[in-house]
Amino acid sequence: MHPGSPDVLYQQNHVGVYRSRDKGTTWERIDEGLPYDFGFAMTVHPRDPNVCYTIPLEPQEYSFRATDGALTVYKSGKKSWRKLTRGLPQKNAYLSILRQAMDSDSLDPAGIYFGTAGGQVFASNDDGTTWKVAAGHLPPIYSVTAAVVE
């Protein structure tokens, strides 16, 4: 749910990525252009209810991992998705990102954060344009919550 636009909801499940603009009465499928329609982590841009971020995962029988060994965050636009990969590992990055392991903060530009089951936290302080490892060698990250402390 977008904090400033409670009518706008996003949903990702085992059969697609969806958006509702009427508090969940109707849903539109918005995963066209993603490499997979399966994945868990998703967060909404703090100021633009039309933009969300997700990390599609390649479904395997017993695990879910970043696609093709590359870690890619996708940012939605009006009718398309854009890859955001600068600073993310692009080779041998067979990482899993769990359902609640992605969030955004309220800064401008927005900070976007996600954690992996391998114990890494990735952070972007520019709406997802560039990424860095904010923490590594942690236990599995099951949930990420961003907070701004002033």
Stretch-by-stretch model annotation:
Residues 1-150:
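Extracellular glycan-interacting surfaces
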